Amino acid sequence: LIDHFSKIFLESIMNDKLFPLYLAGGMSTEQFYGIDAFQKNILNGIGTIAFPLFCLLLSEGFFYTKNRKRYIGGMLAFALISEVPFDIGFFSRYSIAEGTFPFYLQYQNVFFTLFLGLLTLVIIEKVALKISGDGRKSKVTKILCQLGVVIIMAIIAELVKCDYGSQGIVYVSMLYFLRKSRLLQSAG
């Protein structure tokens, strides 16, 4: 929320109000660039840190939830509910021009990425349960099928135009596969 507030409100204030004031001499260079650096480095930086944490919590929550259908349903519901304010905040001028207001169909919020990531984990686990056996051939088949699921879901994320796109799906999946190694998870 902090980075979205920064991008929606502070960026427009910087461009519409403070930059003309700076150009007119009503604000010093230090003042203008100090506010700009705070907005871009601090507030947007908080948002950059948030996504990996969301992915970690999602993959960990996948193991600890008692009702995965409800978990997926809740994530989808939150993605749909949060899409309207997201689209209005970031893309209202485009959606009005396209006649789809309040929806902008060319970009989806981060919760769609998290929803698809969660769905990927469910499918990966179902594939692992379907392909049983302890032999080397079974393990290779299982890994290849799970990798195929990740690739297909990453393509879907790109087609739907989710925030973080295929990278988000790969990141959630990577945290799932590396869940027993905290050292490798932190390197991601």
What are these regions (language model features)?
Residues L1-G188:
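Alpha-helical transmembrane segments and their immediate juxtamembrane cytosolic regions
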